[in-house]
Amino acid sequence: MAVETRAIISDGKGGFADAMLELGDPGPGEVLVEIRASGVCHTDLDSLGWGRSLILGHEGAGVARAVGEGVTHVAPDNRVLLNWAIPCGGCIQCRKGLESLCEAKPRVASDRFRCAEGKVWPSFGLGTMAGHALVPKQAVVRIDVDIPFASAAILGCGVMTGFGSVVNAAKVEAGASVVVLGCGGVGLSCVQGARHARAAMIIAVDVNPDRLVLAEAFGATHQLLASRGDAGLLAAAEAVKALIGRGADYAFECTAVPELAAAPLAMVANGGMAVAVSGVEQVVPVDMRLFEFDRTYVNPLYGQCRPFEDLPKLLALYAAGSLKLDEMVTATFPLSASGLRDAFAAMRSGQGAKNVLVP
């Protein structure tokens, strides 16, 4: 039986509005999820201009309401969270363990989403800013711990991206020195990943003093207030070196500012690793001398997430009191177009860490 639900749908030209959406029954390998919370991410803002009408949202948690044939790992009424980098499990990347780089990208066919406004596609195969989402089974991870839906929802992008960039991609070791540039939700997740890895020094860098207060609460050992006029954060890099006595072993760029894409390279010591976490995609000039002396620069996608290993691990860390998620949700807004406008405004202003839409 088809489900009618309300969704926030973009027009592909920068606008979005509430609309009614009809979802078909789950087919083989599909799950119908009632959305209880949807995180708000910078990528959601970017997606408004992608030239097609989208059911917005790619961070979500809720309750499985119906499952299709062949779905065995979740059942109706299970609490679940959604994963946007959906692995097929069979392509060469998935077989190598690089599931976030899946080449097949399982999707529910777009004709299963019917809207009076015309053809729509679920963002990243999910479309979590809606009352319900119809998704491939590989997108669904069961929640087996006691956690608010809002806290679970943010695991599915920002938290996993930051934490995984530290633990999976960089493989930060105990005793290392780490710099995190930008202390929004992703940067705070890098801080938590570094704390989990038992880094000796975790230096948080931001131009917003309020975010440095958050970074300290999340595990940063040092906080450095940068100047907005510090081009390339070169002065901040010198301050980092003064704190450590040398460059850092690792530096993570979480600002989403194109001009700062190369900034982590200026922070690391010879042989150090700079990690691009925020997903800067613009063409930017880079001083190639920053790569000298075995410095490396990596750009991992989604913290190299293996959803059925990593997301349960993060849930277990939360349940053990070792991962702050409730504290990261600094504001909630109604799951509606007006609520999303307010959430985007809060995000642009730099208020708090993570905004979440709730029904």
Question: How should these model regions be labeled?
Answer:
Residues 22-38, 48-95, 100, 142-147:
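Glycine-rich beta-strand-centered segment in the early N-terminal region that forms part
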Residues 80, 138-139, 144-229:
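Mid-domain Rossmann-like dinucleotide-binding core that forms the NAD(H)/NADP(H) cofactor-binding site
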Residues 74-75, 172, 268:
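Short, well-ordered loop/turn sites that connect or cap secondary structure elements
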Residues 1-3, 262-265, 308-359:
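C-terminal hydrophobic helical "lid"/dimerization subdomain
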Residues 258-323, 359:
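Glycine-rich phosphate-binding loop and adjacent beta-alpha segment
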